[in-house]
Curated annotation (Swiss-Prot):
Ubiquitinated, leading to its degradation by the proteasome. Belongs to the bZIP family. It is found in: Nucleus. One of its GO terms (cellular component) is nucleus. GO terms for molecular function: DNA binding; DNA-binding transcription activator activity, RNA polymerase II-specific; DNA-binding transcription factor activity; DNA-binding transcription factor activity, RNA polymerase II-specific; RNA polymerase II cis-regulatory region sequence-specific DNA binding; sequence-specific double-stranded DNA binding. The modification Phosphothreonine is found at T53, T57. This is Transcription factor MafA. It comes from Rattus norvegicus.
Amino acid sequence: MAAELAMGAELPSSPLAIEYVNDFDLMKFEVKKEPPEAERFCHRLPPGSLSSTPLSTPCSSVPSSPSFCAPSPGTGSSAGGGGSAAQAGGAPGPPSGGPGTVGGASGKAVLEDLYWMSGYQHHLNPEALNLTPEDAVEALIGSGHHSAHHGAHHPAAAAAYEAFRGQSFAGGGGGGADDMGAGHHHGAHHTAHHHHSAHHHHHHHHHHGGSGHHGGGAGHGGGGAGHHVRLEERFSDDQLVSMSVRELNRQLRGFSKEEVIRLKQKRRTLKNRGYAQSCRFKRVQQRHILESEKCQLQSQVEQLKLEVGRLAKERDLYKEKYEKLAGRGGPGGAGGAGFPREPSPAQAGPGAAKGAPDFFL
């Protein structure tokens, strides 16, 4: 009784809070009838669960509120309220006979934190958050890592927590508390083992659920610059230019919008630069072709000019020969050939008169 009074002195003194905690009973609410598949999904225990009842599912999304006092008859069947109170080291129930208290005012805050943490620890269901078993393992790893950091920063709180755990496990009433304690010890060792073995395999992924958000946020913030560097160095200029838009969009899935826009602007710049270079190269090539054709045509024109000059000289030579031949066949040459011409009447009269006596002489 002295232990119970000492514990009662450290409990919250607000009557409204105590009345709310004691009167909060989920069994008085009507249960919505679900199809057989949903009911089978709700009553299926996830692998590695520490509780003997189904965890937080769409059918029971509201966690049962833990109670500092003895559990009500309605909530006694569920492991959410009674089991958590026994585990957290609250006021021992009637079956318990050992001391389950924590002395001193320094353990009050730690007791309340552990009380609510243990109450909500049973309602972390990966299936309710649409998570895979790998995400659940990552959440456990992040939770263990986070609690280890808190223990390193607050050694006094860690020592009080260990003392509180030892006393609560020693003074817990019934086999249920012992089973829960053993289960939690096994879960702690399992979490530590996974933290050491799977840390190198999952350090690139984000943690979901519970305190894993801290690790996930830090990893995401630290990897932003790495993503930017990897995205810039992932594709070369030739790959960006030659890759199709569909293939590029498929490769850019999972990156931030700013990085994708920056990479696409770089690709557009490279394509415009390549198009300008190709146009310039084509213009230079066409100019070279035209210049070569011009040189060929000019050489042909020179050859034709030389041919025209040669033909002109040959023409002049033939013309001169023709004129010479035509001059030899003139009037004097033709008369000696034996074709006499009749003299004109002016020349024929005296010649005939003079030639007649010569002819007769």
